[in-house]
């Protein structure tokens, strides 16, 4: 949430010549309402199920490469973690500091989990999800102090090298 997955993902997809898909967009399209509305009207559990369905629909049976940006909480589900690990050749974790996440998400009304104390929530979510990110990621990019262009360059370099990158 706020690490730059969508922004970086779009640029990486363009550079690679692959389609870009954001799982939140798939959820909104299928649900016929925004992610915020899904959370508010149907609850987080329903959103997570829709998110899992979206990830599965993008990854399973795909014959051509795609750049997929998932929500930061996609890793909560062991099914998602397994699916992503099995179906994706490169899984990039954009590792951002909580301070950076607070600044980046401050202006967005589309982040229902951040209603209230955003800094405390982001710290808690980051701590809860850390082991799952480490489990799934094949590439870890530290985004601290980096521009979007530098993050994209680091991602492309890591993909080309085919190795872990920090």
Per-range role (PLM):
Residues 1:
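The conserved Walker
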Residues 6:
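Walker A/P-loop
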Residues 11, 15, 65, 90, ...:
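NTP-dependent small-molecule kinase module
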Residues 22-85, 123:
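ATP-dependent small-molecule kinase phosphotransfer cores
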Residues 86-131:
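A glycine- and Lys/Arg-enriched "phosphate-lid" helix/loop adjacent to the NTP-binding pocket
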């Amino acid at each position: 949430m706020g690490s730059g997955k969508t922004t970086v993902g779009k640029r990486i997809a363009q550079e690679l010549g692959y389609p870009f898909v954001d799982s939140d967009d798939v959820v909104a399209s299928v649900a016929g309402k925004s992610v915020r509305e899904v959370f508010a009207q149907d609850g987080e559990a329903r959103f997570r199920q829709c998110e899992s369905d979206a990830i599965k629909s993008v990854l399973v049976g795909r014959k051509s490469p795609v750049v997929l940006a998932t929500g930061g909480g996609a890793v909560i589900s062991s099914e998602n973690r397994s699916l992503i690990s099995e179906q994706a050749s490169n899984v990039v974790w954009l590792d951002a500091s909580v301070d950076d996440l607070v600044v980046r998400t401050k202006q967005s009304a589309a982040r229902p989990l951040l209603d209230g104390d955003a800094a405390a929530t982001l710290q808690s979510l980051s701590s809860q999800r850390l082991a799952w990110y480490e489990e799934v990621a094949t590439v870890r990019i530290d985004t601290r102090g980096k521009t979007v262009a530098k993050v994209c360059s680091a991602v492309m370099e890591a993909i080309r090298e085919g190795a872990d990158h920090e």
